[in-house]
Amino acid sequence: MYLTKEIKEEIFAKHGEKTNTGKAEAQIALFTFRISHLTEHLKKNRHDYNTERSLVLLVGKRRSLLDYLKKKEINRYREIIKELGIRK
């Protein structure tokens, strides 16, 4: 499995708190990790349409979290965009 417990803990520790995994930044960082992994998979497997669909759904979930963060805390939004290298 590409997303081990250690990787999750590392992401949560870096982008939030180790115990607060529901923080918007932590969830966005986790979605970004999964999106990058699925993107690499789709480069090798062009006809994997189920993975392509799940990638689109993940991008939508991340976008909605980013919109929420932008509406509530613009400074935290700008930090996470810059830190993860996400386009606006």
Swiss-Prot record:
Check the UniProt entry and state the signal peptide residues, or none.
none
Q: What is this protein's record name?
A: Small ribosomal subunit protein uS15
Q: Which UniProt keywords apply?
A: Ribonucleoprotein, Ribosomal protein, RNA-binding, rRNA-binding
**Complexes and interactors:** Part of the 30S ribosomal subunit. Forms a bridge to the 50S subunit in the 70S ribosome, contacting the 23S rRNA.
In the UniProt record, what gene is named as encoding this protein? rpsO
Protein family: Belongs to the universal ribosomal protein uS15 family.
Does this entry carry the keyword Ribonucleoprotein? yes
Give the matching InterPro entries. Answer: Ribosomal_uS15, Ribosomal_uS15_bac-type, uS15_NS1_RNA-bd_sf
One GO term in the molecular function aspect is:
rRNA binding
Organism per entry: Flavobacterium psychrophilum (strain ATCC 49511 / DSM 21280 / CIP 103535 / JIP02/86)
